[in-house]
Amino acid sequence: KSSRIEGTKTSIEEDMSDIEDISPEKRNDYIEVHNYIDALNQGIYRVTSGELPISSRLIKEIHSMLLKGVRGENKYPGEYRVSQNWIGGSMPSNAKHVPPPHFMLDELMSDLEKFMHNDDLKIPHLLKIAILHYQFETIHPFSDGNGRVGRLLIPL
């Protein structure tokens, strides 16, 4: 369902097929869904094995996997954006949301990590996840793929 939000359309039958059996016009959607599955599985493995906590490093790794060979692959996969972006509108002045400037991203993502791993906070886990997701989307650290990464972080 997360991929469908982005306009990606595949059926379960297509998702279970080999790429060679997918019609050429649907292959990008197929690859995008499989990238999402691979990134989610990698994230779950890295976190549950203790190999890597949910961190900027893991978030960048997941982002890189999500954008491999699909829409957004030319927008610095695995790297935080290096310029201002905005959501909606044709320029920042008429945008629905203007995220923080790129030079603040390392500090903001570090703060987000600290929030994630702060066990002293006495709030329900579901509320903590919702706040994390909202803050991640507000920061919008990547040039593309923020929605996909943000939704993928929820089950981690």
Task: Walk through the language-model features, giving the residues of each.
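FIC/Doc superfamily catalytic core
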Residues: 1-156
